[in-house]
From Swiss-Prot:
Family: Belongs to the CcmF/CycK/Ccl1/NrfE/CcsA family.
Native source organism of the sequence: Trachelium caeruleum
Membrane topology classification: Multi-pass membrane protein
Domain of life of the organism encoding this protein: Eukaryota
Organism classification: Eukaryota, Viridiplantae, Streptophyta, Embryophyta, Tracheophyta
Primary subcellular site in the record, as a coarse category: plastid
Main function: Required during biogenesis of c-type cytochromes (cytochrome c6 and cytochrome f) at the step of heme attachment.
InterPro entries: Cyt_c_assembly, Cyt_c_biogenesis_CcsA, Cyt_c_biogenesis_CcsA/CcmC
Keywords: Chloroplast, Cytochrome c-type biogenesis, Membrane, Plastid, Thylakoid, Transmembrane, Transmembrane helix
Record note on quaternary structure: May interact with Ccs1.
Protein name: Cytochrome c biogenesis protein CcsA
Entry's Gene Ontology molecular function annotations: heme binding
Length: 316
């Protein structure tokens, strides 16, 4: 069997499994069945992880270099990183994080296997600037950081949605209470004590969910920030060897630095308990947008020292 055929089978098998997992989860939101979609989805993502690992190893052997030389390969590695985080979340029994990583895996892999990247989905000879032992260290750290930071930011976004929805519902109840006359108010008081337990339990679970989202978003973003720092530092050393300068302020480097600053601000807000929750989550959501600009948006420009990373070279 040719390497290209094996790659084709592995990548489309993993995409098909992800699609089935997402479909079952969507159906489960509407219809309750006797199946256990959570257990099935975990096994599906683990199988996807193994398929993607097989794809990366196969391409590594076939091409002779680590498969991070173009946008297509970096997207596959990003999808692999999401599935890796998903497995960690599964072992930690964190369903909230695993839901996000499963969706992220199917999104990135779906884009990678779409017709938009057909021209670069085949491995080629590395350009001279990429023929370095720093390729694995720098690009892998950057992609892992993107995966972790994106997952953490999505957890923060979920926290914001729940918090804003709660405040919106409280505002609606306040408006409704102001429109009631005295008779309606007395009738409400009769039923108030019967409903107190229901609302207290409901609010308790919401508070628990918000706290878990806040806790895990902080943990995952902290890990991503470490990877990002290592990626930037290793990239600076590599740049000095390749171009004779540690930093050149080209678009890719500039936006990577902006990304680092945004998440440094996020971590700084975590030092003050008054900024925990929604306040720090807002910074993380901003960081989510910045990451996509840094990773994908800058590549579309095709300018700067990382111009070969647009659609023909590295996409770190």
């Amino acid at each position: 069997m040719k390497f290209s055929t094996l790659e084709h089978i592995l990548i489309h098998l993993s995409f098909s499994i992800c699609s089935i997992v997402i479909t079952i989860r969507l159906i489960n939101l509407v219809v309750t069945t006797i199946l256990k979609p959570y257990d099935f989805s975990e096994k599906g993502i683990i199988t996807t992880f193994l398929c993607l690992t097989g794809f990366l190893v196969t391409r590594w052997i076939y091409s002779g270099h680590f498969p991070l030389s173009n946008l297509y390969e970096s997207l596959i590695f990003l999808s692999w990183s999401f599935s890796l985080i998903h497995i960690v979340a599964y072992l930690k029994k964190n369903k909230n994080l695993s839901r996000i990583t499963a969706s992220s895996t199917i999104f990135t892999q779906g884009f990678a296997t779409s017709g938009l990247l057909t021209e670069i989905n085949k491995s080629g000879i590395l350009v001279p600037a990429l023929q370095s032992e720093w390729l694995i260290m720098h690009v892998s750290m950057m992609i892992l950081s993107y995966a972790a930071l994106l997952c953490g930011s999505l957890l923060s976004a979920a926290l914001l949605v729940i918090t804003c929805r709660k405040k919106f519902n409280e505002l609606l109840r306040l408006i409704e209470s102001l429109s009631f006359d005295k008779i309606q108010y007395r009738n409400q008081r009769i039923h108030l004590f019967g409903k107190t337990y229901f609302f207290s339990v409901k609010n308790y679970y919401k508070i628990q969910l918000v706290q878990q989202l806040d806790y895990w978003s902080y943990r995952v973003i902290s890990l991503g920030f470490i990877f990002l720092t290592m990626g930037i530092l290793s990239g600076a050393v590599w740049a000095n060897e390749a171009w004779g300068s540690y930093w050149s302020w080209d678009p890719k480097e500039t936006w990577a630095f902006i990304t680092w600053i945004i998440f440094a601000i996020y971590l700084h807000t975590r030092t003050n308990k008054n900024f925990w929750g929604a306040n720090s989550a807002i910074v993380a959501v901003i960081g989510f947008l910045i990451i996509w600009i840094c990773y994908f948006g800058v590549n579309l420009l095709g300018i700067g020292l990382h111009s070969y990373g647009s659609f023909k070279g590295m996409a770190s």
